[in-house]
Amino acid sequence: MLALRLLNVVAPAYFLCISLVTFVLQLFLFLPSMREDPTATPLFSPAVLHGALFLFLSANALGNYVLVIQNSPDDLGTCQGTMSQRPQCPPPSTHFCRVCSRVTLRHDHHCFFTGNCIGSRNMRNFILFCLYTSLACLYSMVAGVAYISAVLSISFAHPLAFLTLLPTSISQFFSGAVLGSDMFVILMLYLWFAVGLACAGFCCHQLLLILRGQTRYQVRKGMAVRARPWRKNLQEVFGKRWLLGLLVPMFNVGTESSKQQDK
């Protein structure tokens, strides 16, 4: 349990450090290299378009990250008390997390990167957090590849060029042919690629469970769920104003039925 609580502190710090490093690289390396194009107009220059897109992806990722933490699970105490109070206990899908010491309605899993449990109150923000984190990482990887290609005069036309970039760069780094800053960017390329794929896969997995009306906790425990149309399952999580929530980080906009289940 001590190791889990320690991981609950280290993982958010790791995520915030990676986010800070990404912002620094975008601001001081990638954007200045795009400003060197003299043929581009000031309004539609690559630097402006790249900065606007990266800011949009990052704002949604960090905004939903904060909302996942703010929409924390309910405090412990719902099932405690006398026998007369026991009928008010939550449904079987409710779970008590020993790491959070809280009760989560429609518990899915505990996310160490947010230091919080994922349930009915923050599932929507968690999925959008995974989506925009994946997009931000993959987009940063593409921008980093363009930067490395221009600085080191490397062509990525070959399908295996990205796979052979790391071992080749390591040997050139120790021989003095590659600067330390460029080597750091190359390492970040693979980190962005790994995090982007992991978040994309996790987002798709969560969406599949939502379409089925299930949570990871219910699947792990073998709990039976009531069959419902997939549209209703999506609306329960994302609400009727799903498009607005997809573009702007905002609190849960679930339907009235989902709000009643949280009570």
Curated annotation (Swiss-Prot):
Where is the protein situated, by its record's location annotation?
Endoplasmic reticulum membrane; Golgi apparatus membrane
Question: Can the keyword Endoplasmic reticulum be found in this entry's annotation?
Answer: yes
GO terms for biological process, alphabetical = protein localization to plasma membrane
Task: Say which enzyme class the record assigns.
Answer: transferase
Provide the disulphide bond pattern.
none
Q: Which InterPro entries match?
A: Palmitoyltrfase_DHHC, PFA4/ZDH16/20/ERF2-like, SSD
Q: What is this entry's stated membrane topology?
A: Multi-pass membrane protein
Q: Which residues form a coiled coil?
A: none
Q: Which residues cross the membrane?
A: 10-30, 49-69, 126-146, 147-167, 183-203
Its predominant location is endoplasmic reticulum
Q: How does it assemble?
A: Interacts with CNN3.
Which protein family is named in the record? Belongs to the DHHC palmitoyltransferase family.
Q: What is known of its domains?
A: The DHHC domain is required for palmitoyltransferase activity.
Its name, as the record gives it, is: Palmitoyltransferase ZDHHC22
UniProt lineage: Eukaryota, Metazoa, Chordata, Craniata, Vertebrata
| Gene this protein is translated from | Zdhhc22
